[in-house]
Swiss-Prot record:
Subcellular location: Periplasm
Gene name linked to the record: tolB
General function of this protein: Part of the Tol-Pal system, which plays a role in outer membrane invagination during cell division and is important for maintaining outer membrane integrity.
Coiled-coil positions: none
Signal sequence extent: 1-21
Family the UniProt entry places it in: Belongs to the TolB family.
Pfam families hit by this protein: PD40, TolB_N
Complex formation: The Tol-Pal system is composed of five core proteins: the inner membrane proteins TolA, TolQ and TolR, the periplasmic protein TolB and the outer membrane protein Pal. They form a network linking the inner and outer membranes and the peptidoglycan layer.
Stated name of the protein: Tol-Pal system protein TolB
Domain of life: Bacteria
Keywords: Cell cycle, Cell division, Periplasm, Signal
Length: 461
C-alpha cells in the first residue's frame, strides 16, 4: 500500500527566508527534553485546497487526517497542542506559507505571541479517489520551515498518509522516526467465544483484522522484521492426529499462505525471529523439559540453544537486533530473566528480585529489556538496562475492587520510546502503552474482549 503513497519534497527555494533557516544540527527537540517541558504545537484545521464544489463531500477525509496526526503527535509525549480558541489569526483566510512571500500568508508574530514552538499548516484536496496532503511544519522562534512535503494516495489510505506525515515530523524534529506506521499482532478472544485467534491492528488499535480462524487456542504471535510474516502457536487438529498439539505455524501476509513449521509432540511456542528474519527461536519440549531451539522458516532445526539444567524450564526467547538472546528460566529455582549470545553461550542471570519474572522484550537498540515481574499476587512491567542495572517500574494500577491489577507481556515500539503491554485493571485484558520512563500511559483498546501477548512490529512500508 505504501507504494501508492508518494511523498514529494516541496520546492521551498521560492522563499529565501526558509532556504537557510534550518537548525544547525537539524534537531529541534533532544530526546528526553519533553519529560520536563513539552513543546507547544499549533495545528489549525486543514484547509481544503481543491475545487470548492467538492469540499463538503470530502470533509470527512480531512477530519480523519487531522485527528490521526493530532493523536499521533499527542501520544509521542513531546507536544502539547494549543487550543484553537487561542489562535490570533483566522486560519481559514490565511495561506499555508508566511507573508510577505505569500500575499495572504500568515504572520509568525501571531504564533510567537501565543507561545507556539511549532506550527503545522496543511491543506488537502481530493480528485476522484485520490487525496493530496500538502504540509508545512515551522519552527516559530526561528521563523524556519523545518519540513515541507506533499503526500498522495487513495482516500482509503488517509490514515496511513497521516501516520506517514507524523513519522516525518518526529524524524525532522527529534532525529528519530516515529512508530506510527507500525502494526500490532495479538491473540484475542474477540468474537470467538472460548477460543482465541490471532489479530493484527494499527498501533493505535484501529483497523483490526482477524488473520487466523482455527476455532481453537491460537497464542504467542511474533512479527518477522519486515512485517510480512507472523509466527504463532495454535492447538490445531491435524489430520490423523488423536490429540491437538501446541504446533507452530507461519503466516505469509503477502501471499496468505499458512505453513505448519513445527509440530513436534509437546510445546512448540514462543517464537522470536532472528534479526535477519531467516530463523526463528522457539521453545520445544521434545524429550523432557522445555528448551530453546533455533529453527529455519521451513521447520528445520538448526541447533539447541539451551540445555537444561535437568528439570529446568527455558522459555520465552527474544532476540535483540544485535543477535543477543534473552529468555526466562527457572534453573535457579524461580523464573528469572537471563541473557546469552546467539549460540546460547555466555549465559547471565540479570534479574534477582521478585517471585516470577517473564516475557522479556528487547529495545530496538539492544540497550534495554522490558519484562513482567511478579512481587505479590500481581505482575507489573519493568524496564532495565541489558545487564540488569537501572531497573524502573512502569506500571501500578488497581482494579475497581481495589485489588492490584496485573500488567503483562511487554513489547517495545520500533523507536524504543514506548512499551506496549496488557492490563486487567478494568476486569478484561486490555492493551496499553507507556513511555519508556513510565511518565505517561494510554489505553489502546477499549472493549469487552481480552487481549494476550501483543507484539509491536517495525514500521511497515
Amino acid at each position: 500500500m505504501m507504494k501508492q503513497i508518494l511523498a514529494l519534497a516541496l520546492i521551498i527555494g521560492l522563499f529565501p527566508l526558509f532556504s537557510h533557516a534550518q537548525n544547525n544540527n537539524g534537531i529541534y527537540i533532544k530526546l528526553g527534553e519533553a519529560r520536563t517541558k513539552k513543546s507547544l504545537m499549533a495545528f489549525p484545521p486543514l484547509q481544503y485546497t481543491g475545487s470548492p464544489s467538492t469540499a463538503s463531500r470530502n470533509q470527512g477525509v480531512g477530519v480523519e487526517i487531522f485527528n490521526t496526526i493530532t493523536n499521533d503527535l499527542t501520544v509521542s509525549s513531546y507536544f502539547q497542542f494549543i487550543n484553537q480558541s487561542a489562535f490570533l489569526e483566522d486560519t481559514s483566510k490565511t495561506g499555508l506559507m508566511p507573508a510577505p512571500g505569500l500575499p495572504n500568508g500568515f504572520k509568525f508574530q501571531s504564533w510567537s505571541s501565543i507561545g507556539a514552538d511549532f506550527l503545522i499548516r496543511a491543506g488537502y484536496s481530493v480528485v476522484g479517489n485520490e487525496v493530496t496532503l500538502e504540509t508545512y511544519t515551522y519552527h516559530v522562534p526561528r521563523a524556519a520551515l523545518v519540513l515541507g512535503k506533499k503526500y498522495k494516495g487513495p482516500t482509503s489510505s488517509a490514515r496511513r498518509i497521516a501516520h506517514t506525515f507524523a513519522n516525518d515530523v518526529m524524524k525532522a524534529l527529534t532525529g528519530v522516526e516515529g512508530p506510527f506506521l507500525s502494526r500490532v499482532v495479538v491473540s484475542s478472544d474477540k468474537g470467538s467465544g472460548q477460543s482465541k485467534e490471532i489479530f493484527t491492528m494499527d498501533w493505535d488499535g484501529a483497523n483490526m483484522e482477524q488473520v487466523s480462524n482455527h476455532r481453537s487456542i491460537s497464542i504467542s504471535p511474533a512479527w518477522s522484521p519486515d512485517g510480512k510474516k507472523i509466527a504463532y502457536t495454535s492447538y490445531v487438529k491435524r489430520v490423523g492426529a488423536k490429540f491437538r498439539n501446541a504446533d507452530m505455524l507461519l503466516l505469509d501476509l503477502t501471499t496468505g499462505k499458512r505453513s505448519l513449521i513445527s509440530y513436534r509432540q509437546g510445546i512448540n511456542s514462543g517464537a522470536s525471529f532472528s534479526a535477519d528474519g531467516k530463523h526463528i527461536y522457539l521453545t520445544i519440549s521434545q524429550g523432557n523439559s522445555p528448551d530453546i531451539y533455533k529453527m529455519g522458516l521451513d521447520g528445520t532445526l538448526v541447533g539447541k540453544i539451551t540445555n537444561g539444567p535437568a528439570g529446568a524450564l527455558n522459555v520465552e526467547p527474544t532476540v535483540s537486533p544485535q543477535g543477543l538472546l534473552s529468555f526466562s528460566s527457572d534453573r535457579a529455582g524461580r523464573p528469572m530473566i537471563y541473557t546469552a549470545d546467539a549460540a546460547g553461550n555466555n549465559v547471565k542471570r540479570i534479574t534477582f528480585a521478585g517471585v516470577f519474572n517473564s516475557s522479556p522484550s528487547w529495545s530496538p537498540d539492544g540497550k534495554k529489556i522490558a519484562f513482567a515481574g511478579q512481587s505479590d499476587n500481581n505482575f507489573d512491567i519493568f524496564v532495565m538496562n541489558a545487564d540488569g542495572t537501572g531497573m524502573i517500574r512502569l506500571t501500578s494500577a488497581k482494579k475497581p475492587n481495589g485489588r492490584m491489577a496485573s500488567n503483562e507481556d511487554p513489547s517495545f515500539s520500533p523507536d524504543g520510546r514506548f512499551v506496549m503491554y496488557t492490563s486487567n485493571r478494568t476486569g478484561k485484558n486490555q492493551i496499553y502503552i507507556s513511555t519508556v520512563d513510565g511518565t505517561e500511559e494510554r489505553r489502546v483498546t477499549n472493549d469487552n474482549n481480552n487481549y494476550y501477548k501483543p507484539k509491536w512490529s517495525n514500521n511497515i512500508d
